[in-house]
């Protein structure tokens, strides 16, 4: 056996980096489970480190505050939404099918993880309103929808009478508006409203048909 092909022992720096990654992941997983069960406000840092079986000092080595941890989880949620939309675009060809499929998936996931979703979405929206990092997350959401609309314009199922940026604003604004209404109104029929919104947007953005003769 060639000695050069044998596995090389990890350096102390490599082991420290691996342990750090593992600790980070354990904190995130423990926090997510607790936020899902109790909500953000009812969960303390001591609760999180206890569930993760880590020292409090380790938590603060990774996150300066509990709010910073929630922000990282919120960013991950937006990344998950981006992947869902990308996957839906690979499965479907029309704007109506893409928005309908994506809105349906998101609505189902949000309602299943209701407590956690409320905290994460509130964090994104509050951060945006105060000029914080939530702005970045909302920009990512808008950019993802912009790509879907731009593709629809190229395929011909989205009209070109409005500017692309306006159309992207309409889609992102409608999606966020429905989610906001769900956040603020107990019992709001999120899944149904998202489905209706997707259908409305597809119809509103469809190319205008030229008037027929005699009309």
Features from the language model and the residues they span:
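Basic, helix-initiating cap at the start of DNA-binding domains
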Residues: 1-38, 42-51, 68-71
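C-terminal peripheral helix-coil segments that are non-catalytic and often amphipathic
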Residues: 1-11, 101, 105-108, 142-143, ...
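An amphipathic alpha-helix adjacent to DNA-recognition modules
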Residues: 21-29, 41-42, 53, 62-86, ...
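Amphipathic alpha-helical segments enriched in hydrophobic/aromatic and basic residues
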Residues: 35, 44-45, 55-56, 66, ...
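Hydrophobic alpha-helical connector segments
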Residues: 72, 83-114, 164, 168-171, ...
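Short secondary-structure transition hinges
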Residues: 107-147, 154-157
């Amino acid at each position: 056996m060639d000695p050069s092909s044998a596995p090389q022992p990890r350096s102390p720096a490599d082991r420290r980096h691996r342990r750090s990654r593992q600790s980070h992941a354990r904190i995130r997983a423990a926090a997510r489970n607790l936020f899902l069960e109790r909500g953000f406000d009812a969960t303390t840092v001591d609760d999180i480190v206890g569930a993760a079986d880590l020292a409090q000092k380790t938590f603060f080595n990774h996150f300066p505050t509990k709010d910073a941890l929630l922000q990282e989880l919120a960013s991950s949620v937006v990344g998950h939404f981006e992947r869902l939309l990308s996957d839906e675009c690979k499965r479907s060809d029309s704007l109506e099918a893409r928005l309908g499929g994506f809105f349906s998936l998101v609505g189902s996931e949000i309602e299943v993880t209701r407590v956690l979703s409320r905290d994460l979405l509130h964090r994104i929206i509050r951060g945006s309103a105060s000029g914080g990092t939530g702005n970045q997350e909302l920009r990512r959401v808008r950019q993802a929808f912009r790509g879907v609309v731009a593709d629809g314009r190229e395929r011909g199922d989205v009209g070109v009478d409005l500017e692309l940026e306006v159309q992207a604003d309409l889609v992102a604004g409608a999606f966020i508006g429905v989610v906001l209404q769900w956040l603020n109104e107990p019992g709001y029929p999120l899944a149904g409203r998202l489905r209706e919104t997707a259908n409305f947007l597809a119809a509103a953005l469809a190319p205008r048909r030229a008037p027929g003769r005699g009309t």
